[in-house]
Amino acid sequence: MTQRNILVADPQHSRGADMEGKPRTVVNVAVGILMRADGHYLLTTRPSDKDYGGYWEFPGGKLEIGETVEQALRRELQEEIGITIGQAYNLRVDMVDYPHALVRLHFCKVLDWAGELTMREGQDFVWTQLPCQASPILPGTLPVLAWLENVPADHNDAA
């Protein structure tokens, strides 16, 4: 899957090397775009104790050492929102340069899952459709929302 350009979030905030002067490490994150048959998709808020707390995003989380994107997505969605997902389809990969981290986002479409949504980290959630009305949106989520408006609904690549 080809990575797109780097999005610089909050360019007015400083970045740079880590404490030893080395370039920042890239954090890989699996992101699930859960879509219902009616075209609505799930957004959750980031927990208040994390960077960008309260911002809306697609659910997901960091890959652990040795995990594939799909394995991480399955684990994170079970841990964070209490569901077990079916097939995950790779959609796109974006790099986002946040002031606190350099993040590679692996976006996957998920069309089926089992279990009831349970926000285990105190998040809020909403089923919404395009154009998105939730606000504020996490900067790394904005390009994907715009892209989703222009991609066919049946666009899938197996993860």
Where are each of the predicted segments found?
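Short secondary-structure boundary/capping segments
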Residues: R24, I33, S48-D49, M95, ...
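Active-site segment of metal-dependent pyrophosphate-handling enzymes
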Residues: N28, Q78, G82-A114
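Short loop segments at secondary-structure junctions
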Residues: R36-G39, P47, L111-E116, L130-C132
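Conserved Nudix-box catalytic region and its N-terminal flanking loop in Nudix hydrolases
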Residues: H40-E79
